[in-house]
Curated annotation (Swiss-Prot):
This is Tryptophyllin-T3-2. GO terms for cellular component: extracellular region. Expressed by the skin glands. It comes from Pithecopus azureus (Orange-legged monkey tree frog). The modification Pyrrolidone carboxylic acid is found at residue 1. Its main location: secreted. Pfam families: Tryp_FSAP (PF08248). It is found in: Secreted. Belongs to the frog skin active peptide (FSAP) family. Tryptophillin subfamily. One of its GO terms (biological process) is defense response. InterPro entries: Tryptophillin.
């Protein structure tokens, strides 16, 4: 299984 994304990806605005 894919490793959990934590912390979640942050998208720069």
């Amino acid at each position: 299984q894919d490793k959990p994304f934590w912390p979640p990806p942050i998208y720069p605005m």
